[in-house]
Structures are given as structure tokens and as C-alpha cells.
Amino acid sequence: MNKKTRIRSLFPDARLRYDEAMALTLDSMRAWGPNHSVWVIAWSGGKDSTTLLTVILHLLSEGLLDPPERMIVCYADTRMELPPLAHTAQSLLKRLRAEGVEGRTVMAPMDKRYFVYLLGRGVPPPNNNTFRWCTRQIKVDPMETEIKRVVAGAGGNVLMLTGVRQGESAIRDGRITMSCSKDGDECGQGWYQQMT
């Protein structure tokens, strides 16, 4: 295959093109960003949250978005990353801090960490299909605790940004749909939920 050959998508209507996705993101941020003095980005270091962080920083650096009074990036340190990835995450937080972004590292308390459950309590290891106890415990709960602190300190005027990508697999899409539809939450580009 030569470089000029373009592979057509098997699902042409299932995805937004880059320019469409960027325009929708920019429109959403212009609509909701100015209403919030604090923006919080939940960052795991994975593809989705890193894409979100990169896009928001790009839009701000290009002057396409007005910056908030405060921007906070909360990194979920699971203590399970490979050392080079953990080092890179901390290096990026340091760079963000140098640019005026508040970088915070959140992690589960010792008694809720992966190996304490696996080795200390004998809980079976998680799998991707049916038994995913660790994601909530070592990522979601610590992030939620920190975000509640931020919201309380900001008087509730916080825009929470999370990277969610659908279309990776049917199992993942089902998980996203299930988690986003409980408690009145909404997920996906262009959706906004105002907490009271």
C-alpha cells in the first residue's frame, strides 16, 4: 500500500472527523467554560483523558478559549503503572504547574490499594468483562473525593472535564452507557450536566 492510499472506514457515520470533533468541543467549551471559574480535568494518563487534556491546553494556548481563573488537573495514581509511565506522568504534572495549572496527584488509601486486596485479602484479580472492582477503588473513588474537595472550596462553581471515547468496543460502550446513565449523569461530547 502506498502512502496516498486511503483506507475507508467500515463505519463512516459512526465517528466524527477531527475537525468536526474539535469544532464541537470548542463550541461546548465556549458555551460552558465562561460560566465556571474553576475547571477540573480528571487525568488517568490513558488515551482518553490525555487527549482531553491535550485538546484543552491546545485551545487555551492558541487563544481559542478564554482561560478559567483556576485550572486543576487531577492525576489518578494507581501505583500500578510501569515506572517510566509513572515518571512521565509526574514530569507532565510538573510542567503543567510551571504553566500555572494546578497539578494534583490522587491515590487510594493504603487499605484500598490493588495488592492489599489481591494479596492481603485474597480477592480475585479483576478481569475486563465481569469483575472490575479495582477501577472504582483505585481510580474513581480517590478522584471523586478530591473533586468534592475542589467543588466545596470553589463554592460549587466547577466545570468537570473527563475524557470519554465511545466506539472502542461494544463492551466498553456498554460500560460507558451504564455508568453515564445512573444518577442522572450524561456523558459524551456535547453533553453537559449541571450539578446542584
Functional labels for PLM-detected ranges:
Residues 1-196:
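ATP-dependent adenylation/nucleotidyltransferase module used to activate substrates
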